[in-house]
Amino acid sequence: MAALLLAGLVPVLGGCVPLLVGGVAVGAAAAHDRRDYTTFIDDQQIDFVATAALDDEPGLKGRGRVSVTSYNYLVLLTGQVRSEAEVALAGGVVSRLPKVRKVVNEVTIGPDIDFARKSEDVLLTSRAKLALFKVEVPDFDPTRVTVVTENGVVYLLGLVSVAEGDAAVEQVRYVPGVVQVVKLFEYQEPKT
């Protein structure tokens, strides 16, 4: 009887493992972050809601690709659309969402980047994250910097000191293949 009961629970509890692992991953990421936990979760929600709003926008359907990255209520938009009006539309849709403090609209006009370029951007993001481990500023934690790469341009977001931000840019700008580094840091001096 106990074996039958246990066998019946396995499918039900099986769904708990991904939730538990996901929760641990979010908790670990939040533990290293300088944002408070509420802001960390709000940023994830903004990413989700903004992406859904852009996907649902009739003026953007099938007209390109826009990616969303939220950090401390600042939203970075990257990607490609077909016209200046669509760039403005994407920015307007996201700027009206609750909790969004500022939109940095880096969407460009043109065809979607191809698979090879997307793959190179993924590789550049990995190389940039790895380069951040070379930053030699006391108490700098490279996991506190969010790295987004679009068409060879690397965007750096995070709550950092001026020294940390400058050192991060200095490391990332020498990564082979990086076309440009854009600082979107918010500066705060470390607590003493």
Q: Which functions belong to the PLM regions below?
A:
Residues 2, 11-15:
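C-terminal motif of bacterial Sec signal peptides marking the signal peptidase cleavage site
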